[in-house]
Structures are given as structure tokens and as C-alpha cells.
Swiss-Prot record:
Protein name: Ribosomal protein L11 methyltransferase
Cross-referenced Pfam families: PrmA
Residues annotated for S-adenosyl-L-methionine binding in this entry: 144, 165, 187, 235
Role description: Methylates ribosomal protein L11.
Keyword flag tRNA-binding: no
Record organism: Prochlorococcus marinus (strain MIT 9215)
Catalytically driven reaction(s): L-lysyl-[protein] + 3 S-adenosyl-L-methionine = N(6),N(6),N(6)-trimethyl-L-lysyl-[protein] + 3 S-adenosyl-L-homocysteine + 3 H(+)
Length: 309
């Protein structure tokens, strides 16, 4: 579908909120954004986000505002925080597309914008095609990078994988590329579920081997009896992870492994402590910039855990 017009959303944030905004945009499959320092206040940044006009109705834009407001802990009851405008496609798309480039992650994965032809030098890589709405950058977050880097050393062949907080579907796609026989993707935002389905279809031509679930993790696993996973991928914020760990334990089969990301380096010790308290064995910790990735394993024999809501 040809995109004629775009919404441009502009708002201001404290500079130290940039990481969390990038993380959430990546989670939702939104990759067309920029951050600019304010000349008069270097402690603040202006955020610009471009969204396809035809795909973002009033309800979608309102829901998106609520998501950002919740993250930034603001009350925009007077609707003055967010500024929406309509931008003609020819005013920006052509000039920004030239800045797109394939993004190599680790040694094996390549994130490729869907309209760019694959260069011969990357033909030996595992290609993850992404359609971010003709944006000017993948905005790949360190937490996603860390997960993919960890995944390239895992044999997913014939394995069952759970992706919690699937977002744009990058990790689900990577697991399937690695040979996973079944991928279950869970997210509590319908925009993210739509993005996961769309990008999975783009890579494989169908939605075979993928099951998506909309809702909170704890509710979804109870309702759908999701269990006996070989691997769980959990790229979400540490505060959310803490409340999920007992149920993640329950979802894993014996000797199953979980990869946690979305954790700041300052939070990793607390997460590790909770993992150990829940009978998960720490396997590895890696970091990139200010973010950490933690992998753990469910031992073959442990006390039974209940699922908590």
C-alpha cells in the first residue's frame, strides 16, 4: 500500500527518558523517530515520530498517547503535551530513505528494511526483514541487540519458544529462522501484535508456526495453558519482569532456558536475586551500553510452582 501522508507527533522529554522511549517504540514496531536537543535547555529533548496516516485513526493515536503518558508519568488532560501534524509524503520520505542501511547484529543476524536489496556480502547472514512503515532507521535498542546476540548461539531446531512482549516480532522471527517448530508471541498491546504478525508474514510468507496472544502474560498463560517451553524470550522492563518470574518458571520445561533483557545494569543484581529465589539457575550475564541481558535455566528437578495472578 502506497503511503500518501504521514502523521508527525512531537513532544518533549527529559534527556534521561530517551532510552525508555526508544525501547517502547521498538516494542511497538515503530521505527520512524528522531531525538533533538533543545538549544535553550540541554536537559530536554524533542521527540519526533512519523506514523502512516491511513494506519493511525483517532482511537489508535489516543491509545498511543496514553501509552507514552503512562511511561513518562504525565497527565495530559488538557491535551497540550502532544502535538500532531500531517506531513505530505514527498516532504520527507525520499530524503530520509537514503539513510536506511542493513543493520548487522552480532555475527549472524542482519536486520533488513524490506525495500532494500540484500548486498552479496551479507548473503551468509540470517536475514530479519522489517517493514517499519518506510521510516529512516530501525532504532534497534541495546536490549534487542543483546537478545539476538545471545540467540545466535542457541540451537532452536525443533524447539518450542515463548516470546513475551513480542513488539515488532524481531525475536520471534529470529527463533523461527533458527528452526523453532512453534513460536508463541504474547503482548498486551494490539499494535505490537499486529506488527508481530505483519513482520512474521513478511519473512516467511505465512503465519505457520506462529501463535499470537493479546493480553497480559499472567492472564494469557492461564487462559491458554501455555507451558512446556524449551525457551522463553523476555525483552521487557525490569519492573515488569520481577512479577513474571514465578510464572515464567512454570512455563518452562525441565532444563528449559529463559533470556531476560530490557534490564538496566543498575537493576541486574535485583533480578538475579529474584531468579535464584525462584529456583532458576543463573547461566550468563552480558551488557551493552547501560543495559543487561540475563539467561537462566530451570533445573531438571525443582519444587512445583503455582501460577500467580
Amino acid at each position: 500500500m502506497e503511503i500518501k501522508d504521514w502523521y508527525k507527533l512531537t513532544f518533549q522529554i527529559e534527556s534521561d527518558s530517551e532510552d525508555i522511549i526508544i525501547w517502547k517504540l521498538n516494542e511497538l514496531g515503530i521505527f520512524s523517530f528522531s531525538f533533538e536537543y533543545l538549544i535553550k535547555n540541554q536537559n530536554k529533548k524533542e521527540v519526533n515520530i512519523w506514523l502512516p496516516f491511513d494506519s493511525w485513526d483517532n482511537n489508535s493515536r489516543s491509545d498511543f498517547e496514553k501509552i507514552i503518558s503512562k511511561i513518562l508519568k504525565i497527565n495530559d488532560s488538557k491535551n497540550k503535551f502532544f502535538n500532531w501534524s500531517i506531513i505530505k509524503e514527498e516532504d520527507w520520505l525520499t530524503s530520509w530513505k537514503k539513510f536506511w542501511a542493513p543493520e548487522l547484529v552480532g555475527n549472524h543476524f542482519l536486520i533488513l528494511p524490506c525495500w532494500i536489496n540484500l548486498n552479496e556480502k551479507f548473503k551468509d547472514k540470517q536475514i530479519i526483514k522489517i517493514d517499519p512503515g518506510a521510516a529512516f532507521g530501525t532504532g534497534s535498542h541495546p536490549s534487542t541487540y543483546l537478545c539476538l546476540e545471545k540467540m545466535e548461539n542457541i540451537l532452536f531446531s525443533d524447539k518450542k519458544v515463548l516470546d513475551i512482549g513480542s513488539g515488532s516480532g524481531i525475536l520471534s522471527i529470529a527463533a523461527r529462522l533458527g528452526g523453532a517448530k512453534e513460536v508463541c508471541a504474547v503482548d498486551n498491546d494490539y499494535l505490537a501484535i499486529n506488527s508481530t504478525n505483519s513482520n512474521f508474514q513478511l519473512n516467511f510468507g505465512n503465519l505457520n508456526n506462529l501463535n499470537t496472544y493479546l493480553g497480559s502474560f499472567n492472564e494469557v498463560i492461564l487462559k491458554n495453558q501455555l507451558k512446556q517451553f524449551d525457551f522463553v524470550l523476555c525483552n521487557i522492563l525490569a519492573e515488569v519482569i520481577k512479577g513474571m518470574i514465578p510464572n515464567i518458571y512454570k512455563c518452562l520445561r525441565n532444563n528449559g532456558e529463559v533470556i531476560f533483557s530490557g534490564i538496566l545494569n543498575s537493576q541486574k543484581d535485583e533480578i538475579i536475586k529474584i531468579l535464584i529465589q525462584n529456583n532458576l539457575k543463573l547461566l550468563d550475564v552480558s551488557s551493552r551500553k547501560n543495559w543487561a541481558c540475563i539467561s537462566a535455566q530451570k533445573p531438571a528437578s525443582n519444587p512445583k510452582h503455582k501460577i500467580y495472578l
